[in-house]
């Protein structure tokens, strides 16, 4: 035990603060965890934005940064934004790069252990040949960890959220696309080549729209953000409404909250389609807990 404490003291992760109350013999020395001994950078790479946070070792956010970016269409701009984001959060809190333990990146794509740092070409074809982990390591010289955003959402819920008491959890992320992260016995289930959890590419209508993956009627083709906005615009046009079409999901939700019948119907439509996908997943995996999230 003393060897472990000595090592923790040498790294600065714990600190001797005061003498405790003795129950017999020498008074003990109280040790306290130093949550600002080091820091962690987290990056979320969305389909249309880059967000970044700096946290201490208790995961308390100390600085944040976010900006729109054409992530799917322009990898060079997205990588530039990521570099800018990391520098911005470090500068905002006055943290030297040497105190950063590592950089974690959440990406809207499966991550293959055989191609770490890369996005799946089928999901993000314009990222072919780009390696996010290599780019960030070259820029900052710190360890970089990359994983699917829904997988990381599942881990967050498992450790700090709705799944704390459950080892079997499904985290469903509804955003530009639809993804899922599964934990089984408190471990992420990745499947072969990290593609487990692509619930957005499960077909709920074999006669439905053609998806980029080659299937027809994938969940994403019905309730992914582009599909919902396109459907909402068509409904407004057909109804003769003077309301401008929604430019994003916030516009659609706000219109529904204001009582716009067409927008309310769109939300119900999305809920029904999502319910079909979740029901299929429940019958297949039977997780104890299901968490819905977005991005």
Name these PLM-found stretches.
Residues 2-99, 140, 166, 206-207, ...:
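ATP-binding/phosphotransfer module of carbohydrate and carboxylate kinases, centering on a glycine-rich
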Residues 14-17, 144-148, 182:
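General beta-strand structural signal in soluble alpha/beta enzymes
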Residues 20, 108-111, 176-177:
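Short glycine-rich anion-binding loops that position phosphate/pyrophosphate groups of nucleotides
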Residues 47, 152, 176:
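Short, glycine/acidic-enriched loop or turn micro-motifs at the edges of active sites
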Residues 107, 148, 174, 225, ...:
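Short secondary-structure boundary segments
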Residues 160-223:
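Glycine-rich phosphate-binding loop of actin/hexokinase-like ATP-binding domains
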